[in-house]
């Protein structure tokens, strides 16, 4: 793997309320926040997204976002991407914006590949640095080999050994723990290592300004 550039945590409403300034002081560089899940519906917005976004920005943390996807075909993956774009409108992000694909493990590689491409391409058409999140075996067994070359990968492998399911240069972020501890947050926290200088790259390309 490449050198670690940033220490990141990922968040959803389940992390509750906390002080982002304390989080930053503990050595965390950035956060990736869940926007919501599925196709557009009022109850499918993460009710901490706005609060977390404002708190992280005010604390000077780098911010990214992810949308939890339930789609089982490409047409619905596009609808989920459209929902995400509505939720991030008017915001800017220093880290990529991701589709989170964990519910599609029983589908074929062809269908999974088509869905990831449809979701990410929809985001890219709006000026996003788009990526895909999933567990390591999903990348290995359910996605075509060109996906890691085309989109940045955020790979979950909660072991001491970095993921080898995609080429090392394609792993932008490695989620290495679901049971981390961070000052200012009660309970377990998802922990991530970021291997690319996304803030610099995204700023240079003038992306993620919605």
What are these regions (language model features)?
Residues 1-120, 124-129:
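Substrate-binding cleft of extracellular glycoside hydrolase catalytic domains
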Residues 79, 138-148:
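Glycine-rich, charge-decorated loop segments at or immediately adjacent to ligand/cofactor-binding or catalytic sites
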Residues 50, 64, 131-133, 174, ...:
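Intrinsically disordered, low-complexity segments enriched in small/polar residues
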Residues 67, 134, 157:
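Short beta-strand/turn micro-motifs composed of small residues
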Residues 127-139:
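Aromatic-lined carbohydrate-recognition surfaces of secreted/lumenal glycan-active proteins
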Residues 38, 104, 137-138, 160, ...:
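Short, solvent-exposed loop/turn segments at secondary-structure junctions
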Residues 40, 72, 139, 162, ...:
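Flexible, glycine-rich phosphate/dinucleotide-binding loops
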Residues 1-15, 22-25, 144-210:
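Functionally critical loop-and-helix segments that line ligand-binding/catalytic clefts
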């Amino acid at each position: 793997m490449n050198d670690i550039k940033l220490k990141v945590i990922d968040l959803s409403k389940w992390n509750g309320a906390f002080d982002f300034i304390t989080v930053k002081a503990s050595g965390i560089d950035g956060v990736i926040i869940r926007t919501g899940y599925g196709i557009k519906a009022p109850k499918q917005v993460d009710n901490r997204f706005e609060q977390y976004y404002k708190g992280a920005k005010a604390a000077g943390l780098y911010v990214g976002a992810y949308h939890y996807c339930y789609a089982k075909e490409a047409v619905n993956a596009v609808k989920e991407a459209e929902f995400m774009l509505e939720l991030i409108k008017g915001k800017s992000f220093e880290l990529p914006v991701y589709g989170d694909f964990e519910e599609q493990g029983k589908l074929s590689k062809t269908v999974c590949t088509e869905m990831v491409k449809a979701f990410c391409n929809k985001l890219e058409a709006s000026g996003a640095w788009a990526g895909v999140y999933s567990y390591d075996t999903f990348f290995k067994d359910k996605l075509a080999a060109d996906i890691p070359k085309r989109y940045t990968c955020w790979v979950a492998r909660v072991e001491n050994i970095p993921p080898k399911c995609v080429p090392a240069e394609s792993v932008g972020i490695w989620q290495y723990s679901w049971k981390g501890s961070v000052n200012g947050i009660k309970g377990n926290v998802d922990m991530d290592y970021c291997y690319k200088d996304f803030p610099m790259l995204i700023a240079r390309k003038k992306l993620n300004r919605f």
